[in-house]
Amino acid sequence: MDTCTDQSVSPEESLDASPASASPAAKPQPRSEPQPRSEQIAQAIGTTLLYIVPAFVYLRFASAADFDIWWHLRTGQWIAQHHAIPHVDLFSSATMGRPWEAYSWLFALLNFQLFQRLGLSGIVVYTAGMILAITVALHHLVKRLQQDFSIGLLLTGAICLTMGRLYVPRPWLFTILFSVFELNILMHVRKTGRLRELLWLPAIFALWANVHIQFIDGLVILGIALTESLLTLRRTATRIPLRPIALTLFGCVLATLLNPYGWHIYKTAHDLAVQPGAFNLVSELQALPFRDISDFSVLFLSFACVAVLARSRRLPIFESLLFLFAAIVSFRSQRDLWVMAIAAAAILASNITGRKTPHRLPAFSSLLFVPVAAAALLLASFALHVNNARLSARMAKTLPVRALAVAKARNYSGPVYNNYDWGGYLIWELRLPVSIDGRAGLHGDERLHRSRVTWTGEPGWATDPQLIRAGMVIAPVKAPLTQLLRLDPKFKLAYQDDLAALFIPANGRPILPMLPPDLPPPVMH
């Protein structure tokens, strides 16, 4: 039973009943706090700590050295300067003028505004804020499905730990957040039949389509809900009626068209999904390496999902298809491990039997803990000295900050030849067209392969047309190409530090890139 009887005795009262306290001379003891209050205080403390810890761990190792954030910042700056959305590439010499869709334009603009006001700290503010939002949303999803507070708290914490490697300043944090929103709505509607919550989904997708291309994953989840309704027309206990879910999916597809590129964004999503070279060459797109605890967490969560689904009397169609989709996506690419994480949160929370926690805090109470957690994280950032100076020092250990300072001081010109990882930072810092950067979909498999061949010093490296025409080569000091250029009489070493080497043509006369006459110059001040 969940209710307490009048005969229940608290531990404090049992102590009062000891022989010493029962003597006639003993003074009456004050009545102890009622048990419900102590339980709710414990829940409040546990919830607040849950909200703080994931973002605190990020702040402990916070860095602004993410490779891709820099070309996003440059895109946001261009949008702010021109009050327009780019439709052609402006940043790479190899793809200058080709059609390009900045599908994360809203993310880029948001982060540029934060950077403009707060400097490198703005990047940390975005990331920590999104981690807090994801944690709160995930806990709300789990609480709606799991009646045991302790199980819900531990499960949410485990999911947050699993996604730890994704806590970097990327637009996929929005995708994780919106996916949790979507799954929360779908699971609650399936459980309660309250269809009005479905009205939130088109608005979510309209925003989603302007911050990250992986809104496609959200549409797949909606498609799974529709499939369940089609396959269980005679069952209504755990499905959404066919007409509402079909209209919701249609409305969400229409909502995604409210972006600067219209339906063309679906072609971009298709091209990215079927680009095999990127999944083999780009580390974050490769399969899980199982060298980190979060990798094994994904595996253990998937085992747990199989166990709870297998013991069901009747195969739960939505949960089973959701798990299958999550397994395919997450084990294909480590960047998408979040799909299995949030799918496991929903599946396990709704299927693990726990003790119903009496005296639970009101549903709205979690919102009261958010500002407390935010204030604690702000204080933690000061205590950990998370400031622009510290972030700059950390960034200089990963990105060629000093080498680029020398290149700008000496007025070295392009074309620039660089590797894949550093291209985004060069776009931001040098304001010269780069040879390649983190936009794998724009450059295509052929360019990615050509760059890898050159940088690893494989046969034919010296025939790379972009290397031949380079006016400046910025190279990791330990890269195979760097050692080859030291011996190449066509290049001379202009600068070197512990991280980067800077080469220029030995004859001192680089060939400048030709820009299409109908395009603005890529250098914009």
Predicted regions and their residues:
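Transmembrane-helix motifs of polytopic, lipid-linked glycan transferases
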Residues: 125-145
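Membrane-interface transmembrane helices that cradle and orient dolichyl/undecaprenyl
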Residues: 180-197, 304-312
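Transmembrane catalytic cores of multi-pass membrane glycosyltransferases
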Residues: 68, 80, 85, 213-313
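Membrane-proximal, lumen/periplasm-facing interface regions of secretory-pathway glyco-
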Residues: 361-410, 422-424, 428-430, 440-442, ...
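Short periplasmic/luminal acceptor-recognition loop of GT-C membrane glycosyltransferases, typified by
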Residues: 408-446, 466, 470-477, 503
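Membrane-interface alpha helices of multi-pass inner-membrane proteins
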Residues: 56, 159-163, 197-213, 251-256, ...
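Short hydrophobic alpha-helices at membrane interfaces in multi-pass membrane enzymes
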Residues: 188-206, 242-247, 317-324
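Transmembrane-helix signature of polytopic, membrane-embedded enzymes
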Residues: 50, 138-161
